[in-house]
Amino acid sequence: MSRIGKKPVPIGAAKVSVSDGLVKIEGPKGKLELRVHPAMNVKLDSDKKELVVTRPDDERQNKALHGLTRSLLSNMVEGVVNGYRKSLEIQGVGYKADIKGQTLTLTVGYANAIALPIPTGVQVTMEGATKIHVAGPDKQLVGQFASDVRRVRKPEPYKGKGVRYLGEVVKIKPGKAFAGTGAATK
């Protein structure tokens, strides 16, 4: 049995409905739904307030789907109750970000500013001009958008300029050493 898949998913304060392979979860932070693979069976145990995922057999693919389905449901419950948040910081002279409507504009050393449309279900806030906070109930969407923002200008290894996750450690490489007297002598 899958070690992750066999654990029930505690619902807590979320409202859950299961019908025909579609799981809908609603909470204070929003609503999410997941179409479950036809081989997986999801049951709502309303007495214990938990979701239980079962699989038909011990086939390799079903074992993998078992743990995956349970993890996705757990992330959905956590997201609609508490939400997810990723923070990024911009480092570099003149590097900054700005939000206009549903667009995040990054000025990070290119000739033109980079405009990224903010997906629905994701809230983006700024702290100053160099800190970006991405939040929302969908863990995959929050992580993907934060990754897209970072991908615009990854931290470079010599000075560390670029967009990085808050607290991310960037290894700085040493530059070229001064040649000294070796190059000019004959």
Label the predicted regions.
Residues S2-H66, R70-S147, R151-K186:
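N-terminal intrinsically disordered, cationic/polar leader segments
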